[in-house]
């Protein structure tokens, strides 16, 4: 597959692939031509590596139909080079979204790419542009299962939902504020925590 060097009486000859004639398809693989060198001291290991890369590029189809310059033509033979492995294209990335709660329940939302939640918030994701994820204040829009699952995992939305919808307020009385560390508890409620 690779050209082999031929020793001449004058100097070392290097075989490099030539561009194929586009009209004559019987000359595939490409013809090999020899170039005599009068000074063999110019050859070094770096130029042999470059020749190997040139031969690899030609084998991969990089030189078909193109003319090579003089700098690319005058290179020594390739030294023990391996052909690079073919590129591996990963398949589509699928991930199931799990929402914790009473037991583990599976929400069947499939995401087809590695786009994080932050990318969706700034408008680079697949779901919606920025600002469309929440329709009514803090409530998520019910368009897709994935958005609803992400809204359930948001602590800010669950606390506002719990205060607004789950705590009944008596007529004429506001609901009691949440207990913080600065508020003092009565004696009866202190005994519950001690």
From Swiss-Prot:
One GO CC annotation: cytoplasm
Entries under Pfam families matching the protein: DUF5559
Main location: cytoplasm
Source organism superkingdom: Eukaryota
Entry keyword annotation includes Cytoplasm: yes
Residue segments, region Disordered: 62-93
The keyword Cytoplasm is annotated on this UniProt entry: yes
Reported tissue expression: Expressed most abundantly in the brain at protein level. Present in cortex, cerebellum and midbrain. Found in neurons. Elevated expressions detected in Alzheimer brain samples. Also expressed in testis.
Miscellaneous comment in the UniProt entry for this protein: Originated from non-coding DNA sequences (insertion of repeat elements especially Alu). Seems to exist only in human.
Protein's UniProt name: Uncharacterized protein C20orf203
